[in-house]
């Protein structure tokens, strides 16, 4: 019963978070349909990544609705339970109340840190966080060539090349590409531009983490769905957008199911982490759109 309740709460939380995005009914339906297989896969493994994804989306939604204090709670809660919640800070520059958001982050960080001390000693809580950090560092090294972990852009490049190099050679350029659109300050006021940042942030979290596993791609598929319905290039590159979406559904989402030829899955997709390929191409296109499209001009 506990497991069933856990899965229902996580799924309900994610569904509610997506429903709060400013999407038309058909757009909402597309996002759900694109991601449903990966959400189902994550549910079967009782993955907390469902809840983390919901928190990141909610942090975006609450900043959009100017409820920065509660957005801070989502960011802190996600960060202090699985670290990935820190991605919510990607929307900081879109906040109209940055001081309120900053003070909220400090307030909730203190509350969430102290709360376990109601039933555990301060020493135990501090030691637990230190051990958690040490484990994350240790696992980062183990995951580099793990078949079932690091199913990311990092893992794909390591496995295809067979080379052992520092992930920083990929992460640093990735961070620069991710951050470059922030320079287009005039575009901040356009909702489509901000939506693309949500998609980019969710994809970045998956593509540039050595801890990414199959179940984590529910986050990426939600990001892909949001990009597809909110991209400003539907009129200029509709064929390419549709191709990338179908390619992503086939290789990223369905490659782990029995609908996909087993020999391709076992001999190519899994050994070379090719699940990351379509999402990488889409992420690069998102960054290109953010850097080149005029979001200020009213869209059709």
Q: Which residue stretches match the model-derived regions?
A:
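Transmembrane helices and adjacent periplasmic/lumenal helix-loop junctions
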Residues: 75-92, 209-219
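Transmembrane alpha-helices and membrane-interface helical segments
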Residues: 54-65, 92, 96, 100-101, ...
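Primarily membrane-embedded glycan-assembly and transfer machineries that use lipid-linked glycans
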Residues: 1-70, 96-217, 221, 295-296
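Aromatic-enriched
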Residues: 228-300
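Compositionally biased, low-complexity segments enriched in small residues
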Residues: 3-6, 77, 237
